[in-house]
Design a protein with these regions (language model features):
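Asp-based, Mg2+/Mn2+-dependent phosphohydrolase catalytic module
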Residues: 52, 56, 72-166
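A metal-dependent, Asp-based hydrolase signature
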Residues: 1-39
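Short, flexible active-site loop motifs that bind/organize anionic cofactors or intermediates
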Residues: 15, 23, 41, 66, ...
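Short, acidic loop-to-helix structural element flanking the phosphoryl-transfer center
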Residues: 22, 37-67
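Generic detection of well-ordered alpha-helical segments
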Residues: 26, 30, 34, 45, ...
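N-terminal-biased segments
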Residues: 5-9, 64-68, 80-85
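Sparse recognition of residues in long alpha-helices and their boundaries
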Residues: 17, 48-49, 153
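Conserved acidic
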Residues: 20-24, 43, 105, 129
């Protein structure tokens, strides 16, 4: 959010000092996470079609499955457990939070996952939902499938070879 506000403009009522702005952005992130978690817990933000089946088939064949997100680790773990159930969640490795110095489109989080799971990046398949994630996966040397959503379809279809419409 800081980068966005610095690039566009800080809201008129936003704090003026760097320290106050840092606290302001942290409070926005916290509130966003609370609202997002409420949507997940109420099942108002379900998995995209086909995701659960894909995960089940991968796990059933012994494929290593990971979730890579620069969001808060606690929130990501809760989301995975809530949407996929605790049995699946315990079989999925989560890379989240500030485990890498740079966020997507930098490939660091994907490369960390591949290294940790001892998998060659070229044999990884990433399922993403954005151009930023697609760029990160490609920069890591990984194949990428982008799922369609209302907020990304028009831009993503021009940048990738595989768009999943389910």
């Amino acid at each position: 959010m800081t980068a966005y506000f610095n690039k566009t403009e800080w809201p008129a009522k936003a704090p003026k000092t760097d320290e106050e702005r840092k606290e302001f952005v942290a409070s926005l992130h916290k509130r966003k996470t609370e609202l997002f978690m409420a949507l997940i817990e109420k099942k108002l933000l379900p998995l995209r079609p086909g995701v659960q089946r894909l995960i089940d088939e991968a796990l059933g064949k012994g494929v290593k499955v990971a979730v890579c997100s620069t969001s808060n680790e606690k929130a990501v773990s809760a989301i995975v457990s809530c949407l996929l159930g605790p049995d699946r969640a315990e079989k999925i490795t989560i890379f989240a939070g500030d485990v890498v110095p740079r966020k997507k489109p930098d490939p660091a989080i994907y490369l960390l996952a591949a290294t940790t799971l001892e998998v060659d990046p070229s044999s990884c398949v990433v399922v993403e939902d954005s151009n930023i994630g697609l760029s990160a996966a490609k920069a890591a040397g990984m194949k990428c499938i982008v799922t369609k959503s209302g907020y990304n379809f028009l831009s993503v279809k021009y940048f990738c070879m595989i768009v999943v419409v389910s």
